[in-house]
Amino acid sequence: MPAESGKRFKPSKYVPVSAAAIFLVGATTLFFAFTCPGLSLYVSPAVPIYNAIMFLFVLANFSMATFMDPGIFPRAEEDEDKEDDFRAPLYKTVEIKGIQVRMKWCATCRFYRPPRCSHCSVCDNCVEEFDHHCPWVNNCIGRRNYRYFFLFLLSLTAHIMGVFGFGLLYVLYHIEELSGVRTAVTMAVMCVAGLFFIPVAGLTGFHVVLVARGRTTNEQVTGKFRGGVNPFTNGCCNNVSRVLCSSPAPRYLGRPKKEKTIVIRPPFLRPEVSDGQITVKIMDNGIQGELRRTKSKGSLEITESQSADAEPPPPPKPDLSRYTGLRTHLGLATNEDSSLLAKDSPPTPTMYKYRPGYSSSSTSAAMPHSSSAKLSRGDSLKEPTSIAESSRHPSYRSEPSLEPESFRSPTFGKSFHFDPLSSGSRSSSLKSAQGTGFELGQLQSIRSEGTTSTSYKSLANQTRNGSLSYDSLLTPSDSPDFESVQAGPEPDPPLGYTSPFLSARLAQQREAERHPRLVPTGPTHREPSPVRYDNLSRHIVASLQEREKLLRQSPPLPGREEEPGLGDSGIQSTPGSGHAPRTSSSSDDSKRSPLGKTPLGRPAVPRFGKPDGLRGRGVGSPEPGPTAPYLGRSMSYSSQKAQPGVSETEEVALQPLLTPKDEVQLKTTYSKSNGQPKSLGSASPGPGQPPLSSPTRGGVKKVSGVGGTTYEISV
């Protein structure tokens, strides 16, 4: 019965036990009601007391045999003995007192049954020392409840004998009154007691024999030890004492408990992973920076699930609260340049798509390259000495990068890897000069608007073709002259600086307000830095050598003073109006600018008749003093002829490095000079200003180089 609580209710199982209980309780009640009062008067008052004690003992043992756990073994879990369920043999043999005893595998309970254990087909459980299943108590009789069953049989037999005997005595005393009610009820109780006495007495005798011999009903019926010796017997007295006087066996099943539903209040709930600030320490080339980002529970899960090959998720937007001065500037640049970048810019190569720029200062945070360039460009005006300090550290090349210098933060303390031939894919990239009285600390990367898409695409194409290697990407810090510059008086900020992130319309409106006419000064003496061709491919080296040869062979322009050492400087200049300045960065300028060769105290002689006050700066060159950047119009991407009186210089565009698709984009992108129409860049000088050099009226000469490449040279 204890095992039936969780199973389907079967009324037929309770019929025998209910009948036994009714007969036991009903017959005894009638005996106490009609027979015991007369026996207490005629025989002894002890007769009702004896029968009452015997009845209670019978009822107690009956209840214990019915409701007590017989010794059920718990079933194994589904995956506990999975291998044994398929591969185990049907029997295993153990030795008990020198006798081999078989243990059978139970497929239902999924374990080997211990000795004297059997699976009950009614209860559907394996019971320790299984005796039999008794329907009168509706329970299996096993090791734990066999004692109470045996005592129930003994007490019931004695009780039946007492009821029958005392009822017969009452009838003998009232033999003249057999038709009376008391005598009739007593005779009915005697019939019931006599009817149950024979089977109960027989079953009791059988179990007395089994107990004396140390056997169970199952072993006796199946004949396990019929022809041999019982290894479980300890003699008659020991067997009886073991059944009646031994301590009860342990219970293997826990008592069934109802699951309680408990309402958990918030203090006991584990807090979910909410959006919060997570600080990550980043070690890169000896620079420690704190990266504060907001990560949610979903992003953490995605990061954990991603493999090492997967592309990292895009970094979050920069925290504008830390850069209060640039809020308005960034808002305008983002809103007005988003449409231009979406149309003209190619997709960023995967190689440097998500490269945050780390700052050497503790207050700067790591951000994506576009936003980092915007913020760091503004910070470089206020903190110019951070590059000077970081440039003295050795350059680490543990992680090569193809990102242009103009997209990097000026305070980033790593050496810049740049393509020396990327200038061939730009329209006006060979503009650079140096003024007097410059300072080493103020180094800025000023690029023209529109060079972003071309430099990205040229770098991506060269990387795919395998024509460049990471070691050939030289940096300004590699030059031996970089550290030989002496600090001069601190100059004012550049007057003609226009943010490359401003739209063309805003830049055009602000140009007239920012840049007044400047008085021309003498030029600066320059000496070329050695060009490094270490790890370039053969085609590129041959193209460069042929380009140098063509430049040497071309006749000098009238009115042009050729200084020694300037033949291969890679610097070209075209005239333009003073109110339309433009500066552009070039990889050639970054490697060819001799920072320590110009005397600081004397004025320089002008080159090409170009005022020094209208000079631009390269990537690796220090910031000029009171000069303002100046830029003319390139004639490589313009279809108009130069006006009379205006000189045009030679400019070689390395067109084989670009695909036709790139050229179309370049013509569209570079039709404006820093956000201004081409007409502004090609305007003739004022009437009071003499022409800077005599014009060159030659045509365009096409020269075929090594590898089938074709160059267009303006002669």
From Swiss-Prot:
Catalytic residues, chain numbering: C134 (s-palmitoyl cysteine intermediate)
The keyword Acyltransferase belongs to this UniProt entry's keyword annotation: yes
Membrane topology: Multi-pass membrane protein
Extracellular side: 35-38, 170-191
Modified residues (Phosphothreonine): T294, T303, T348, T350, T411, T436, T659
Pfam families per record: DHHC
Subcellular localization: Cell membrane; Synapse
Chain segments carrying region Disordered: 289-715
All residue ranges annotated as the DHHC domain in the record: 104-154
Domain of life: Eukaryota
Alphabetized GO MF terms: palmitoyltransferase activity; protein-cysteine S-palmitoyltransferase activity
Segments of skewed composition (Polar residues): 442-478, 666-677
List of residues that carry Phosphoserine: 247, 296, 299, 345, 380, 398, 406, 409, 415, 425, 429, 432, 529, 554, 621, 684, 694
Residue spans, topological domain Cytoplasmic: 1-13, 60-148, 213-715
GO biological process: innate immune response; lipid transport; positive regulation of NLRP3 inflammasome complex assembly; positive regulation of pattern recognition receptor signaling pathway; positive regulation of protein localization to phagocytic vesicle; positive regulation of protein localization to plasma membrane; positive regulation of pyroptotic inflammatory response; protein localization to plasma membrane
InterPro entries listed in its UniProt record: Palmitoyltrfase_DHHC (IPR001594)
Reactions performed catalytically: L-cysteinyl-[protein] + hexadecanoyl-CoA = S-hexadecanoyl-L-cysteinyl-[protein] + CoA
Feature: compositional bias, Low complexity: 359-373, 422-432
Omega-N-methylarginine sites (modified residues): R617, R697
Function: Palmitoyltransferase that catalyzes the addition of palmitate onto various protein substrates such as CTNND2, CD36, GSDMD, NLRP3, NOD1, NOD2, STAT3 and S1PR1 thus plays a role in various biological processes including cell adhesion, inflammation, fatty acid uptake, bacterial sensing or cardiac functions. Plays an important role in the regulation of synapse efficacy by mediating palmitoylation of delta-catenin/CTNND2, thereby increasing synaptic delivery and surface stabilization of alpha-amino-3-hydroxy-5-methyl-4-isoxazole propionic acid receptors (AMPARs).
Family designation: Belongs to the DHHC palmitoyltransferase family. ERF2/ZDHHC9 subfamily.
Description of its domains: The DHHC domain is required for palmitoyltransferase activity.
Protein name: Palmitoyltransferase ZDHHC5
Organism annotation: Homo sapiens
